[in-house]
Amino acid sequence: MTQDDPGKMHSDWIAKVVEDVLEPEIPILDPHHHLWLDEGHTGWPYTLEDFHQDTGSGHNIVGTVFLECHAEYRKDGPIHMQPVGETEFIARIAEQSAVSGGAEIKAIQANADVSLGA
């Protein structure tokens, strides 16, 4: 394996640990995850499909909270509105997650640069 394929490296790293499913009847709200389409964040995209693969391991993950990660910002427009692109992106993905049969994105913790003022 070379460092030319960071997505494969990540998959191999994840596969090193398999968690036992303890008490699968207990509903879990995962309070922290990210999604992104580009490779700039980590060297590979992390999509709803990847998210469902990770959360579909047998644990009873009934919902999740997306935390901002500077993904899918608007490329143009006023700088104070560029983070809204991430919220729009995740809102669309959350709608898809609601009908997918997998873990559902229940909340979004978004970003706004308050140092820009009102």
Question: Would you name each region that the model predicts?
Answer:
Residues 1-118:
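Helix-coil boundary/capping segments in enzymes
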